[in-house]
């Protein structure tokens, strides 16, 4: 269990190419407490049966960190093509789904997860899985104070496939099926919750997955402020 000043994430990426094994990155971030981070990192390395291929430590101010994708760009360039003629950021075609976990995944759960990674790699298909630590300030807010329904989660999982814009439609349809299938594979270990910030159109019980027991209250608010559903999408909150 990390101190609340630290945040960590395990990022597993693979290209679906025989000559490139899946790559695991462990990221730890600290707001100003460098010595604490370094000590925790050393303690963690001592527990590993193997050593990392490479390590690096980077210091950023807050603004730089929030604009990481815009490193080396002027502000007019740090935009998408439809936002500025000078834009240099590019959109991607993405399929994404997610899970929340209230406890550590068992060995059987990890084997199930890695089995799916291996299968997709052998099929020549790329992808990524992010395991992101929660707790800390997230869990310190009472569950009924905001619409976010996953305050008790220990960590989240994000299942991702990212391709260039214009990627083959059948390839992206298959990617959407795979990321959603990961929820089925991990169902025995997860809470059943899902991360709202990118919706998964294949989640059937989306209102429960995104909002949990908050959905009815959100329906009441929707009915009060947007009864005609001016703001709407397929998995949007329906007014009470």
Region annotations inferred by a language model:
Residues 1-240:
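Soluble FAD-dependent oxygen oxidases
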């Amino acid at each position: 269990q990390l101190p609340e000043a630290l945040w960590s994430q395990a990022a597993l990426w693979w290209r679906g190419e025989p000559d490139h094994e899946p790559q695991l990155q462990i990221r730890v971030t600290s707001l100003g407490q460098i010595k604490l981070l370094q000590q925790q990192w050393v303690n963690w390395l001592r527990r590993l049966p193997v050593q990392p291929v490479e390590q690096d430590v980077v210091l950023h101010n807050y603004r730089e960190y929030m604009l990481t994708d815009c490193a080396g760009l002027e502000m007019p360039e740090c935009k998408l093509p439809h936002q500025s003629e000078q834009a240099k950021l590019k959109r991607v075609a993405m399929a994404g789904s997610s899970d929340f976990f209230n406890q550590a995944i068992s060995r059987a759960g990890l084997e199930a997860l890695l089995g799916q990674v291996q299968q997709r790699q052998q099929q020549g298909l790329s992808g990524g899985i992010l395991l992101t630590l929660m707790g800390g300030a997230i869990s310190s807010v009472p569950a009924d104070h905001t619409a976010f329904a996953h305050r008790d989660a220990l960590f989240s999982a994000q299942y991702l496939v990212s391709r260039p814009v214009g990627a083959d439609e059948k390839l992206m349809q298959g990617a959407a099926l795979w990321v959603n299938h990961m929820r089925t594979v991990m169902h025995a270990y997860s809470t059943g919750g899902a991360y709202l910030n990118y919706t998964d159109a294949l989640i059937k019980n989306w209102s429960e997955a995104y909002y949990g027991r908050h959905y009815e209250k959100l329906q009441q608010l929707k009915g009060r402020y947007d009864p005609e559903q001016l703001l709407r999408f397929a998995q949007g909150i329906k007014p009470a």
